[in-house]
UniProtKB/Swiss-Prot annotation:
GO CC terms: NADH dehydrogenase complex; plasma membrane
Function: NDH-1 shuttles electrons from NADH, via FMN and iron-sulfur (Fe-S) centers, to quinones in the respiratory chain. The immediate electron acceptor for the enzyme in this species is believed to be ubiquinone. Couples the redox reaction to proton translocation (for every two electrons transferred, four hydrogen ions are translocated across the cytoplasmic membrane), and thus conserves the redox energy in a proton gradient.
Family: Belongs to the complex I subunit 3 family.
Catalytic activity reported: a quinone + NADH + 5 H(+)(in) = a quinol + NAD(+) + 4 H(+)(out)
InterPro entries: NAD(P)H_OxRDtase_bac/plastid, NADH_UbQ/plastoQ_OxRdtase_su3, NDAH_ubi_oxred_su3_sf
Gene: nuoA2
Source organism of the structure: Rhizobium meliloti (strain 1021)
Name of the featured protein: NADH-quinone oxidoreductase subunit A 2
Length: 121
């Protein structure tokens, strides 16, 4: 394929970026700007926030598990197509996937040793 065949795609991407930037710029000019403290306060079911949620930081352990889930889901996305074409790619493909899985395993072991999977503080 030549570079000229990608020219319409370049125009389309450029147009999309320009329209998005123009929309954000115009909306920032037109919207009212009236900051007040109540706007930034946490709101839950019409009740005043109390305790740690009233402005302090609190620990949410679920985000680490969510990140690990995404990482290993991406691994599975690479692993299934690799298993389908294993005979065609041969030994080199096997070694590449082994290195990929080894790197993920090292990262998982690091997270485990650092206590990222522990629920108690």
């Amino acid at each position: 394929m030549t570079a000229m065949e990608f020219l319409p795609v370049l125009f389309m991407v450029t147009g999309i970026v320009l329209v998005a930037a123009a929309t954000l710029f115009v909306s920032s000019l037109l919207r009212p700007s009236n900051p007040y403290p109540e706007k930034n306060a946490p709101y839950e079911c019409g009740m005043e926030a109390a305790g740690e949620a009233a402005g302090g930081r609190f620990r949410v352990p679920f985000f680490i598990l969510a990140i690990l889930l995404v990482v290993f889901d991406v691994e599975a996305m690479f692993l299934f197509p690799w298993a389908v074409v294993l005979k065609e790619i041969g030994f080199v493909g096997y070694i590449e996937m082994f290195v990929f899985m080894l790197l993920l395993l090292v990262g998982f072991a690091y997270a485990w040793l650092k206590g990222a999977l522990e629920w108690q503080e």
